[in-house]
């Protein structure tokens, strides 16, 4: 088939597709599918008559190399699919299609996105997967409507791989985009600064390039690629260093100087960011164009050949940026980026010194040793890590390099030793990719935990003054974290000599408080990254700022103690600061519990689990720290511990155990360890549940029959009918709770372990609360509605058995802790406390309702009253059940 026939057939197919699209409609939103037609350009002539009506256009799986400005006439275009073509540059004309909402440009060969791409503010879906991108532009952070972003199978190093996580991209697209935008917005200023310096360096180096073309004619052309050694910072192609080659020279005989084959890079379309020009391989003396070099740092100094990449940049920062130096005696040698030299004269002197060494060691040996030393003692200068390295050209090596005493196996052995060094950056290739990914994630999480991103709250255009105030103090939180880390790293060498055992215990307890609060603070700051509610962020930042102040105060007290000769002089200030830290911890817990749903609803489950574990462990640490702090000072009238009551092991954990959803059980009360009391409690629970089941069954059967006005009394008020129905629903729910408690009792008797006991106490809490709710409502209705005698008798028996169970648990707790019934807890106590009993530990907030006079719980009556004046809930003073009836 001739080319004319092929073109005619293709045009006919396009006309048929256009006609089908017009027939399918709608009139002003045509859908046109021109995929798989082997198109090399857009058929603008055939689409001209409908160009203003096309809303969806598919051009996938063709051979389109570019898209011209004619596409701007497609004013209604909202969906464009140009995947699987041969685009090498992003079409600039697409950046002016403001109506575009969905763009699929995947499976092409695009290496970067233009700056004008940020004008597509209406873009909702962007798929740029399977291209050759190194970086995502920072303006993506300012696209408010972006809902889906597909970037997998690129060579992206900015953002780093643990931010551009493909697993998160598949599981939670909203969180994935939030992470991408947050990272880009935080590093936008750094990226712009480096980009501007890169362009200026390229312009200045272009002048040096022409000057060196006239003077320097003895150096082999080569490229050198170096990446920053500090992988914890953002890496973009703007930060990578490409060194320009100097032009080839000719030998005195007039022939072109030969270049070692190993120093020439192959032209590969899949090479990541290589500016290698094929003319270099043919000995062309023309340097690369400025357009090729305007993004990279340039240096006209002699350089070795660009080492071959050992791994694809798709693996990101988990792998070294260049391959290891070959062991060949004439091969290129790579030097550490940290030891960058900028003076060519220094490099020449270094070459001469190593070439004319008198010890018989070859230059290769010296360079390998220098390379190993540099990696074992890396520089911390970030600027040096991004500069180029002066290299020794292969032609400058003396003849002794070829006849060196060092053999290839010895070089390989040195390389193996260097690779196995724990201080070598290249040793990271020995680790599995999963481990490296976790390490990079931890590095990024550590950075994010030290500073909160500046969020833009679309829902709150006018943040509260307190929020602005807290944002101005975010740097202070970083100083606090640094101070805590510095203190714990230095206490081993600068610790004050301890002469008093009480002081040692107090100081160690205060350190535990400091460490716990600092860890909780960092975990909460990390959790705030997943929250976008301005109210929650305002409240949390306020309490975190208060915690910062208390941490700083405690650290200052520690420093004063270390500087003083007598450490006991500052014991009062340390104790006061420690108690203030505990108060701030309590406030943190209260606010966290209040906004727990907002903090955890959008967060990854691993972060939530880590936060809850830290909260629980911090509560245990603070609880243990209170015991040594209490006797640390002499008891006096104005002593802060004069009214302090020692808390039970379960009172402090109640807060954290509620947050952790009771994953970890609290300590068992001593009563459980007593077989006799244990048996009595189980028998009483069995009696209470049997009694409750009887009366609840009566209520469930009676209430639905009695709440019908035509069956009982037509004068019953509608609100009373609704109350009766509510009583029936509460009774049904209480019946289910009672069955669960009975089943839990059987389980605990079969498997008497600590966790089962804690679950047993939890079910007891639910049982008591349900009986209280039913009893309260029944008592309120007893003055308006006449219950049957059997129902009242059953309620009386159920409340009596519940009261006996409460008495048994309370009396068993008296033997467990005597201090719980001593002096009352002061109002200004750092941790407000419910009286510590096994029941209060199990019931939590329900313990307060048990002591309420409204339900006449026995917990509110002295123990002596139980034996002298037992007035039941549904009986009068004479024990007459009918006395409560109308």
From Swiss-Prot:
GO annotation, biological process: positive regulation of establishment of bipolar cell polarity; RAM/MOR signaling
Domain of life: Eukaryota
Bias-annotated ranges (Polar residues): 243-277, 312-347, 394-406, 419-431
Main location: cytoplasm
UniProt cross-references to Pfam families, sorted A to Z: LRR_14, SOG2
Subcellular localization, as worded in the UniProt entry: Cytoplasm; Nucleus
Residue windows of the LRR repeats: 28-49, 53-74, 76-97, 99-120, 122-143, 145-166
Name assigned to this protein: Leucine-rich repeat-containing protein sog2
Organism: Schizosaccharomyces pombe (strain 972 / ATCC 24843)
């Amino acid at each position: 088939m001739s080319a004319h026939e092929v073109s005619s057939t293709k045009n006919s197919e396009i006309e048929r597709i256009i006609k089908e699209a017009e027939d399918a409609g709608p009139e002003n939103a045509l859908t046109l599918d021109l995929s798989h037609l082997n198109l090399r350009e857009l058929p603008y002539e055939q689409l001209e008559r409908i160009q203003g009506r096309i809303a969806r256009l598919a051009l996938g799986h063709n051979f389109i190399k570019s898209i011209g400005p004619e596409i701007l006439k497609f004013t209604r275009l909202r969906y464009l699919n140009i995947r699987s073509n041969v685009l090498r540059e992003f079409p600039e004309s697409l950046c002016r299609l403001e109506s575009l909402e969905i763009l699929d440009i995947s499976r092409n060969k695009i290496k970067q996105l233009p700056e004008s791409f940020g004008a597509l503010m209406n873009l909702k879906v962007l798929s740029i997967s399977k291209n050759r991108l190194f970086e995502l532009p920072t303006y993506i952070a300012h696209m408010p409507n972006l809902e889906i972003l597909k970037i997998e199978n690129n060579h992206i190093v900015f953002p780093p791989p643990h931010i551009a996580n493909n697993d998160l991209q598949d599981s939670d697209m909203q969180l994935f985009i939030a992470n991408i935008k947050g990272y880009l917005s935080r590093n936008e200023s750094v990226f712009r600064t480096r980009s501007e310096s890169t362009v200026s360096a390229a312009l200045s180096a272009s002048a040096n390039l022409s000057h060196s073309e006239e003077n320097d004619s003895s150096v082999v052309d080569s490229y050198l690629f170096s990446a920053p050694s500090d992988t914890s910072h953002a890496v973009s192609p703007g930060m990578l260093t490409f060194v320009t080659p100097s032009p080839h020279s000719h030998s005195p005989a007039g022939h072109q100087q030969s270049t070692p084959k190993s120093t020439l890079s192959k032209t590969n379309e899949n090479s990541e960011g290589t500016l290698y020009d094929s003319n270099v391989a043919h000995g062309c003396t023309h340097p690369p164009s400025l357009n090729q070099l305007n993004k990279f740092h340039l240096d006209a100094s002699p350089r070795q050949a660009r080492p071959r990449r050992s791994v694809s940049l798709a693996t990101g920062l988990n792998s070294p940026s260049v391959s290891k130096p070959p062991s060949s005696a004439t091969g290129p040698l790579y030097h550490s980026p940290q030891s960058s030299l900028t003076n060519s004269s220094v490099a020449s002197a270094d070459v001469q010194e190593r070439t004319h060494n008198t010890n018989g060691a070859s230059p290769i040996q010296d360079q390998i040793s220098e390379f190993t030393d540099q990696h074992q003692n890396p520089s911390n200068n970030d600027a040096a890590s991004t500069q180029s390295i002066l290299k020794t050209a292969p032609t400058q090596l003396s003849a002794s390099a070829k006849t060196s005493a060092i053999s290839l196996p010895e070089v390989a052995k040195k390389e193996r030793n260097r690779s196995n060094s724990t201080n070598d950056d290249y040793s990271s290739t020995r680790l599995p990719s999963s481990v490296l990914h976790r390490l990079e994630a931890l590095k990024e999480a550590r950075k994010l935990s030290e500073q909160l991103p500046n969020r833009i709250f679309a829902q709150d255009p006018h943040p509260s003054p307190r929020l602005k105030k807290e944002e101005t103090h975010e740097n202070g939180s970083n100083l606090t974290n640094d101070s805590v880390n510095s203190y714990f790293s230095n206490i081993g060498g600068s610790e004050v000599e301890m002469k008093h055992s009480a002081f040692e215990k107090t100081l160690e307890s205060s350190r535990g408080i400091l460490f716990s609060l600092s860890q909780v603070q960092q975990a909460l700051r990390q959790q705030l990254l997943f929250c976008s509610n301005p109210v929650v962020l305002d409240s949390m930042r306020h309490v975190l700022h208060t915690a910062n102040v208390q941490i700083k105060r405690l650290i200052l007290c520690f420093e004063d103690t270390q500087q003083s000769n007598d450490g006991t002089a500052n014991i009062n200030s340390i104790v006061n600061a420690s108690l203030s830290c505990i108060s701030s911890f309590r406030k943190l817990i209260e606010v966290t519990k209040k906004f727990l749903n907002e903090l955890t609803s959008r967060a990854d489950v691993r972060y939530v689990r880590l936060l809850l574990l830290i909260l629980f462990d911090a509560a245990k640490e603070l609880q243990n720290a209170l015991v040594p702090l209490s006797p640390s000072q002499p008891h006096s009238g104005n002593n802060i511990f004069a009214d302090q009551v020692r808390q039970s092991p379960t009172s402090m954990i109640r807060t954290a155990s509620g947050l952790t959803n009771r994953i970890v059980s609290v300590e068992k009360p001593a009563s459980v360890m007593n077989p006799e009391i244990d048996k009595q409690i189980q028998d009483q629970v069995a009696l209470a549940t049997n009694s409750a089941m009887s009366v609840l069954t009566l209520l469930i059967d009676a209430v639905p029959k009695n709440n019908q006005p035509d069956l009982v009394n037509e004068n019953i008020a509608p609100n009373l009918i609704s109350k009766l129905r509510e009583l029936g629903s509460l009774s049904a729910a209480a019946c289910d709770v009672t069955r669960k408690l009975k089943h839990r009792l059987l389980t605990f008797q079969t498997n008497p372990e600590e966790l089962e006991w804690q679950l047993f106490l939890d079910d007891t809490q639910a049982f008591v609360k349900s009986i209280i709710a039913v009893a309260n409502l029944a008592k309120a209705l007893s003055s308006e509605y006449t219950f049957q005698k059997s129902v009242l008798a059953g309620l009386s028996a159920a409340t009596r058995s519940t009261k006996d169970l409460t008495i048994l648990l309370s009396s068993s707790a008296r033997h467990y802790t005597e201090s719980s019934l001593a002096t009352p807890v002061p109002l200004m106590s750092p941790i407000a406390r419910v009286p510590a009993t096994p029941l209060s530990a199990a019931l939590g907030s329900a313990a307060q309702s048990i002591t309420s006079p409204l339900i006449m719980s026995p917990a509110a009556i002295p123990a002596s009253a139980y034996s002298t004046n037992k007035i039941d809930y549904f009986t009068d003073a004479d024990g007459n059940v009918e006395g409560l009836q109308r």
